[in-house]
């Protein structure tokens, strides 16, 4: 069932994709589609996910604010919070911090470390230090092929493949 599969996977792109309308509209989008909850339970779930993403206090609980008025980092966290509303088992991130400043990047990284305790997190990144800080396992790819994979600490401290060693020496 493709609908059930879609509900199990959250996708966060490189550039935040906020929907037209308010923060609340964005947060209720998937929740209204995939979950049958009372109005009170929907509101509680929205607040919980915004808090988890570290955004609720920053917007002072103003969910009627336009989503497009948020900063880039806030929009990225809104997208993460929106995905969390349906409790996905897997979250896929494509360069989640590439367009963010260091403060917002560190906030997103902290959130990803928290999320990976309960969900499977897959991150595509060219940022080696970010991979080292977040990932439990790393897959190093070149030209669409797996060069090496294993525990992140092992890959970064004792890479087995020459291409991995060369890449880490250049950028790691």
What are these regions (language model features)?
Residues 2, 25-41, 56:
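ABC-type ATPase nucleotide-binding domains, specifically the catalytic core motifs of the NBD
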Residues 40-60:
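Conserved ABC ATPase "signature" region
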Residues 65-70, 74:
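Conserved ABC ATPase signature
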Residues 87:
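Conserved catalytic motifs of ABC-family nucleotide-binding domains
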Residues 91-94:
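Catalytic Walker B motif of ABC-type/P-loop ATPase nucleotide-binding domains
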Residues 149-150:
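ABC ATPase "signature
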């Amino acid at each position: 069932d493709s609908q059930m599969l879609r509900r199990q996977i959250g996708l966060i792109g490189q550039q935040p994709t906020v929907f037209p309308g308010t923060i609340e509209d964005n947060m209720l989008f998937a929740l209204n589609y995939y979950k049958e909850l009372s109005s009170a339970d929907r509101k509680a779930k929205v607040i919980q996910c915004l808090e988890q993403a570290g955004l609720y206090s920053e917007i002072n609980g103003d969910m009627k604010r336009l989503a497009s008025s948020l900063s880039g980092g806030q929009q990225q966290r809104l997208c993460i919070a929106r995905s969390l509303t349906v409790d996905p088992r897997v979250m896929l991130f494509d360069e989640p911090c590439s367009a963010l400043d260091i403060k917002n990047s560190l906030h997103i990284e902290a959130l990803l470390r928290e999320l990976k305790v309960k969900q499977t997190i897959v991150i595509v990144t060219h940022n080696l230090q970010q991979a080292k800080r977040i990932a439990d396992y790393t897959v190093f790819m070149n030209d669409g092929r797996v060069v090496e994979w294993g525990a992140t600490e092992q890959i970064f401290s004792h890479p087995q493949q020459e291409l991995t060693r060369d890449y880490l020496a250049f950028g790691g």
